[in-house]
Amino acid sequence: MTENTAETADESSDGGVTATTGAATTTPTTPPEPVIRARDLDVFYGSERALESVDIDIPEQQVTAIIGPSGCGKSTFLRCINRMNDRIDAARIDGDLTLRGTNVYDAAVDPVALRRRVGMVFQEPNPFPKSIYDNVAYGLEIQDVEGDHDEIVEQSLRRAALWDEVSHQLDSSGVALSGGQQQRLCIARAIAPDPEVLLMDEPASALDPVATSQVEDLIEELAEEYTVVIVTHNMQQAARISDKTAVFLTGGKLVEFGDTDQIFENPEHQRVEEYITGKFG
């Protein structure tokens, strides 16, 4: 009779015997790859440097807030992700910025195809002078998105928490909606092509408190499906809705990045604490 012990013998591939213990081995977990990664990212407008040596890893299906004083490079960084800076003749981008491991500035990357993967919502609601339906369906048509467009439009409006308010008037003009409804329409338009990332540049700054609250609730819901990166001047908003916060300060430098609770409750850098507590900015 063979006695059971904590040590067992396994036959190796070369015929030998390898002793292994019965103790459980813990395999270190590898952190998931970030959706967006920047390394040594610099942006220049002519001779003026807008971003300097930015390193950041943005995680999947979380809300990452970008905060900092005016002119610190927040929106410039956001526009790098979907190459909106390409439209500025004097802009020059150095360094690496990857989306799921692919450098978005590689010559083989089509900016139009990139923007299908990376949707964007701007500061001011900007619905097209079209019907509510056509506002959402427009991106599907120009990007040749397959599938039932009626169904996609409805799903997008539902995800943007707008369907119940407009389902009876899809042929009405999008510009006739209230400001908050217009912004949610723009969000529906941005998510209709089913992007991986949703960029939001001060999406609630032009809205009243009620509409702002609706958009904030929506952002938290959208993070269950999308990676959301939001630029905001409203630090209370960043604290309420984001999982991660990046703090840019003068000169386009990313000074601190981490969990939002840690950034707001116990920042590592004095300048970050001074900015958050309103001593400058």
UniProtKB/Swiss-Prot annotation:
It is an enzyme of class 7 (translocase). Pfam families: ABC_tran. It catalyses: phosphate(out) + ATP + H2O = ADP + 2 phosphate(in) + H(+). It comes from the Archaea. SMART domains: AAA (SM00382). Residues 15-28 have a biased composition (Low complexity). InterPro entries: AAA+_ATPase, ABC_transporter-like_ATP-bd, ABC_transporter-like_CS, P-loop_NTPase, PstB-like. Its EC number is 7.3.2.1. Residues 36-276 form the ABC transporter domain. Part of the ABC transporter complex PstSACB involved in phosphate import. Responsible for energy coupling to the transport system. The complex is composed of two ATP-binding proteins (PstB), two transmembrane proteins (PstC and PstA) and a solute-binding protein (PstS). Belongs to the ABC transporter superfamily. Phosphate importer (TC 3.A.1.7) family. This is Phosphate import ATP-binding protein PstB 1. It comes from Halobacterium salinarum (strain ATCC 700922 / JCM 11081 / NRC-1) (Halobacterium halobium).
